[in-house]
């Protein structure tokens, strides 16, 4: 049975990473969390004391840094220049800064090239904001996973490691992130015309994973 590539897109807090990881496990595929790559760049910039006023320096640092994604017992481990940043890149501070990093065309160009190289041999499940529209436009299966802002905030609140953040603040942050992602000039968040829309507000994680797996199986067996 030939391998395919699976593109999973959607807004912040939709559960893309968890679903993509579980789907990859079930298929025996490699999971690539593109959001973690943008978060890794954001973490590096914050370590360097760079912000949106230093775009030239940001691009220069991004070209030199080395990002590694490695499988771990509880999901993917992320390393920047040999330092593990798996937990560090999930902070609320990173959440609030990653959109402006992702909006820089040169940053996207660097990371998209890496992502396309990773997917060249097939057998990849990749999640992000523009996988089906830009990174892997020829992916055999494309899914756009979404849920209401309230549901996405509630899910993120359950998994947050920040003891200070409130549910209301998360809702506000997600709304802001949606606006930034949808309105950016380079590869905005948009559903690919040939993507399957999966509204998961009333669905369990297991139901979402099963739905995506069914789409993959239907394609491989010619049922699409």
Where would I find each of the regions flagged by the language model?
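Hydrophobic anchor at the beta1->P-loop junction of P-loop NTPases
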Residues: 8
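Walker A (P-loop) phosphate-binding loop of P-loop NTPases
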Residues: 13
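Small-molecule kinase domains that catalyze NTP-dependent phosphoryl transfer to phosphate-bearing small molecules
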Residues: 70, 115-122, 129, 133-134, ...
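Hydrophobic positions on the alpha1 helix immediately C-terminal to the Walker A/P-loop
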Residues: 19
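N-terminal phosphate/diphosphate-binding loop that engages ATP/GTP or pyrophosphate donors
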Residues: 25-91
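ATP-dependent NMP and nucleoside kinases share a basic, alpha-helical "lid"
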Residues: 86-161
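Glycine-rich phosphate-binding loops of nucleotide-dependent enzymes
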Residues: 142-150, 156-159, 197, 204, ...
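Conserved lysine of the Walker
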Residues: 16
């Amino acid at each position: 049975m030939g391998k395919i590539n699976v593109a999973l897109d959607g807004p912040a807090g939709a559960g893309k990473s968890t679903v993509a990881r579980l789907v990859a496990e079930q298929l025996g595929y490699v999971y690539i969390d593109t959001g973690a790559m943008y978060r890794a760049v954001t973490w590096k910039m914050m370590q360097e004391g760079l912000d949106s006023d230093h775009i030239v320096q940001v691009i220069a640092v991004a070209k030199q840094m080395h990002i590694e994604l490695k499988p771990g017992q509880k999901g993917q481990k992320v390393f920047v220049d040999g330092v593990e940043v798996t937990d560090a890149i999930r902070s609320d501070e990173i959440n609030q800064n990653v959109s402006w990093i992702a909006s820089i065309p040169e940053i996207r160009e660097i990371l998209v090239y890496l992502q396309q190289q990773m997917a060249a041999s097939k057998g990849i499940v990749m999640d992000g904001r523009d996988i089906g529209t830009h990174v892997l436009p020829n992916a055999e299966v494309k899914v756009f996973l979404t849920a209401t802002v309230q549901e996405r905030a509630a899910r993120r609140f359950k998994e947050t490691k920040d003891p200070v953040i409130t549910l209301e603040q998360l809702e506000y942050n997600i709304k802001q992130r949606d606006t930034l992602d949808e309105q950016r000039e380079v590869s905005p968040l948009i559903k690919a015309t040939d993507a399957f829309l999966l509204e998961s507000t009333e669905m369990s994680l297991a139901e979402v994973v099963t739905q995506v797996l069914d789409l993959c199986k239907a394609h491989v067996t010619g049922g699409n």
